[in-house]
């Protein structure tokens, strides 16, 4: 296909805004084939597109050799990329904004979840008479890891109801069987986690949900707008140095997003595509957790336009030293890579 000089200049100019012009005008050769991705709670449905991209070979199709390191929570995964042991994080959208407030420039470049997919509830054993948020005062609340998005939902909920983060004790319980055990055995009074943990605890009768962000409707009501969730993000310096590698990562995640959408009426296919350990020995509960979270998965990897503004409001309520005036939300996300991925894979 021939490209006119005007078209070339337009394309190069648009790419230049992100420092990507060289990637557009050259052959798409990967700058790096080996990519280390850090994630906090890989088996969670929150990160299902990452696992699908891995298990179905989408990363390999792009010429990538991806290694994935799993941590106890998103905050730990973030520390890995900041510390240099990982290149990219599969983590919460708002983490890039929090980093920018500290003078570190990271950018979300492809979306996995368009809702936080987090359920916050109380133990039916320790808090059988729960009636209002005030009952949480002095209680032990389990989150995947302190500072993670599960922690953010707790603090946001507390702030909305006149409580402070210091009114409760936050305890890291991870994102798997350990989290389930912590609630069932009474080590914690409440829990904020994602599926399949939340659905498993609901299914066993151990959890009463008080906040649910697994659907777009509930998410918008709680946060006052779209609140993007799981993304791939990395430093702006990494994007500038490896735009083709970043594009390849986005391609793989967009394909995974679209594959998940195509299986909405075939949850067995999704359950069969993930490692058996994800099922926690209960395939039916895992499929029920998928059903509860289906609305929250991104259909195309595109970040909603109002997502950054919503994240700013959430962080202002969640992080004590976060100053909205010191950040530029437009610099913490881009849809350029996801757009090109959709052009390359319109049907997944």
Model regions: which residues?
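Short, glycine-/small- and polar/acidic-enriched structural segments
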Residues: 16, 28-175, 185-195, 206, ...
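Short, solvent-exposed loop/beta-turn-alpha elements that line the ligand-binding surface or hinge
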Residues: 61, 128, 215-225, 295-304
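N-terminal export signals
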Residues: 7-26
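Secondary-structure end/capping motifs
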Residues: 239-322
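Conserved C-terminal helix/tail region of periplasmic/extracytoplasmic solute-binding proteins
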Residues: 309-348
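Extracytoplasmic/secreted proteins, especially bacterial periplasmic and envelope-associated proteins
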Residues: 48, 54, 76, 80, ...
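Pocket-lining segment of extracytoplasmic ligand-binding domains
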Residues: 178-181, 185-276
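Secretory targeting signals
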Residues: 1-3
